[in-house]
């Protein structure tokens, strides 16, 4: 349910109060029972669930459509009267997701195994206060699943965007951008689009600099880093194109000319996604052996506990997770795209290694 002091509990109960959502899957909520009860009361939604202590053994009955709440209330008292970043909120929200990852990684015949994980919003500041080195969910999932190649991606009705870099100061982007960091989201995003039924995805790659560098006048990253990554992808049959100026490529993508845009940094990709797909966009971590999605918003401490949060993005995240999990059930092979340095793909090992810490 994400940070217990944010809007995560509210959007969870609102989403699961929808009978159409509840019929899609059997749900296990990792959270605090008292927090969920309070959220349901404030939002005035009716939702029944089973509760078990998080520390107890449990097995989910596949025929039961009521959610199962793994209750962490025994972990300690939580002051919900003042929403905001806290050490305890960080400890709890990390415990929720750590246990969910453990259950998603269980053997296929284990009754506790999850087919997908949909994460509620966490506070990166709370995680930092609690002493965790991970800046967010994406990095933790990659570490726990031993996924060397992964990318943060956003899917909305009008745009799909994958990021070459994510949670970095803007001044650092040009220093960490490598051929591998640009190649990975092209390759992984291509596979994701194919999972959605797009046989031959058309991919546009953004430049880093104004006017995509204007032939080196405003920077050399386009020719030195981005174009070689595009060429490597094209050599294995990926329809990758660019680099294009970031201020115009999203217009064409929103009009349907591109199935995926690869952005070089966080705000370059997320501003158009949220502008055009607010309340419907979903964050997906591509490249993992498990399915992980999340709503595209944060904890919104400023409106937490007021019953005002929209559950639209959480519903969309659940719907996409169910779709991806169903697809994987018919094809148990997890993503194993070719990285730079493997047969059929040109590149240097240094660039590939540098991409291991991508978001």
Which residue ranges define each predicted feature?
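Ligand-binding beta-strand-loop-alpha-helix segment within the catalytic cores
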Residues: 59-64, 154-183
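Contiguous, glycine/small-aliphatic-enriched amphipathic segments in soluble metabolic enzymes
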Residues: 1-137, 182-264, 268-283, 288-291, ...
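Short, flexible loop segments at boundaries between secondary-structure elements
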Residues: 144-159, 288-302
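Active-site glycine-rich loop that binds ribose-phosphate moieties when present
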Residues: 140-148, 170-194
């Amino acid at each position: 349910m994400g940070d217990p002091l944010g809007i995560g509990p509210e959007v969870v109960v609102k989403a699961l109060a929808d009978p159409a959502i509840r019929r899609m899957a059997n749900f296990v909520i990792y959270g605090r029972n008292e927090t969920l009860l309070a959220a349901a009361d404030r939002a005035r939604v009716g939702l029944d669930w089973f509760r078990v202590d998080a520390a107890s053994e449990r097995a989910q009955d596949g025929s039961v459509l009521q959610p199962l709440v793994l209750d962490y209330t025994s972990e300690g008292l939580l002051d919900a009267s003042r929403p905001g970043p806290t050490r305890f909120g960080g400890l709890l929200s990390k415990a929720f997701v750590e246990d969910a990852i453990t259950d998603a990684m269980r053997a296929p015949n284990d009754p506790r195994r999850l087919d997908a994980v949909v994460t509620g919003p966490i506070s990166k500041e709370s995680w930092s206060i609690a002493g965790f080195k991970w800046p967010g969910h994406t990095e933790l999932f990659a570490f726990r699943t031993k996924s060397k190649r992964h990318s943060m991606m956003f899917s909305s009705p009008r745009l799909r965007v994958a990021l070459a870099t994510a949670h970095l100061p803007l001044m650092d982007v040009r220093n960490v951008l490598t051929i591998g960091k640009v190649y990975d989201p092209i390759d992984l995003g291509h596979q994701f689009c194919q999972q959605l039924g797009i046989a031959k995805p058309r991919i546009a790659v953004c430049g880093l600099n104004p006017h995509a560098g204007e032939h080196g006048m405003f920077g050399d990253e386009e020719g030195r880093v981005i174009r070689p990554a595009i060429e490597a992808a094209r050599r294995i049959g990926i329809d990758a194109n660019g680099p294009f100026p970031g201020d115009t490529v999203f217009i064409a993508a929103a009009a349907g000319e591109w199935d995926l845009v690869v952005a070089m940094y966080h705000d370059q990709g997320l501003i158009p996604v949220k502008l055009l797909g607010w309340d419907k966009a979903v964050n997906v971590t591509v490249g993992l052996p498990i399915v992980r999605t999340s709503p595209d918003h944060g904890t919104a401490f400023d409106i937490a506990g007021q019953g005002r949060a929209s559950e639209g993005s959480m519903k969309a995240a659940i719907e996409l997770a169910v779709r991806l999990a169903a697809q994987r059930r018919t094809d148990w092979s997890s993503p194993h795209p070719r990285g730079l340095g493997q047969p059929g793909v040109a590149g240097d090992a240094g660039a590939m290694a540098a991409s291991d810490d991508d978001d």
